[in-house]
Amino acid sequence: MKSSVPSLLIACLVMSLNSYTQQVLYCPPTPAPENVTEFVCNSPSLHEFPTGFPARAKMISVEFTQVSSLGVEALQGLPNLQELHLSNNRLKTLPSGLFRNLPQLHTLDLSTNHLEDLPPEIFTNASSLILLPLSENQLAELHPSWFQTLGELRILGLDHNQVKEIPISCFDKLKKLTSLDLSFNLLRRLAPEMFSGLDNLEKLILESNPIQCIVGRTFHWHPKLTVLSLKNSSLTNIMGFFQPLEQLELLDLSDNELTTMEPPVYKTSANLSLDLSGNPWACDCRLDNLLTWVNEHNIHLYSKEEIVCASPKHFKGECATSLHKSQICPC
């Protein structure tokens, strides 16, 4: 008896193709049926932001276009708009007041544009925002006024910009924020006042910044933090920085300049994972203490084979986790 699997696969593919071809993407001035509330205008040849979106529109996507500016009235008359996707365009700035009269807007994607700055009160009337990706732009400064009315915000993406410092209390109104991505910027120093107010923060991504200094108690007021990435920074010392973070599930310290380290936390969560790879470790009694702590607390180590000794000379290039205690710490 011949298998019916190929015929079933063909049937499924045909059904999927039919469904795809039947899906019509509407963009003004093309008229849309009254039940259509989502509009997609993603033509690479589009140079001007479309006009004529109906008041019932709930989602508008104008992405992967040549659009470089929006008029201050571009989004007026859209009281039901919930999602606005403007990524992968050529936007350089936005007019103040652009997002007024959008009481239901919860998602605003401005990623992958050419934004160098934004008006101080650009998000003042966007108080319902939950998701705000500003990643992959050219922002060099953060203005605290941007975030003063975003009390509902949960996810903020500021990665892949040119931010050199975070103003004091910049995020202190973001009481509900759970995820903050500041990776691939130019931060050199971290201090407690930079992250004040982020009482519910669970995920903080700081990797690929030239961070050389972390002021004591920087992370002491973020007990809910479960993911912290400082990968690919320039850290040489992290003594005591993470002790209050008892709910940590992932701590990524890979690709730094660490030669030695005390156990990063006293009390660990049941499923803590740790990445120590890519550092120039000194394979001595201090490292043995760290690895003993890892084993005793059942810590999961990522990339064990890349935890390599840089010193002493007779251990250089050796995998630290494969060495016996009597070799590393013979005393």
From Swiss-Prot:
Q: What is this protein called?
A: Phospholipase A2 inhibitor
Signal in keyword set: yes
In terms of Gene3D superfamilies, this protein maps to: Ribonuclease Inhibitor
Please state the span of the N-terminal signal peptide per the UniProt entry: 1-23
* Glycosylation, residue list: N35, N125, N232, N271
Q: Which Pfam families match?
A: LRR_8 (PF13855)
Per UniProt, the keywords (alphabetical) are: Glycoprotein, Leucine-rich repeat, Phospholipase A2 inhibitor, Repeat, Secreted, Signal
User: InterPro entries of this UniProt entry?
Assistant: Cys-rich_flank_reg_C, Leu-rich_rpt, Leu-rich_rpt_typical-subtyp, LRR_dom_sf
Give the UniProt subcellular location, in the record's own words. Secreted
Start and end residues of the LRR repeats are 78-101, 103-125, 127-149, 150-173, 175-197, 199-221, 223-244, 245-268
Q: How is the subunit organization of this protein annotated in UniProt?
A: Homotrimer.
Highest taxon of the lineage: Eukaryota
- Provide GO CC annotations from the record: extracellular region
The record describes the protein's role as: Inhibits the enzymatic activity of the basic phospholipase A2 (PLA2).
Q: Where is the LRRCT domain?
A: 279-330
Q: Does the keyword Glycoprotein apply?
A: yes
Q: Which PANTHER family match?
A: IG(IMMUNOGLOBULIN) AND LRR(LEUCINE RICH REPEAT) DOMAINS, LEUCINE RICH REPEAT CONTAINING 53
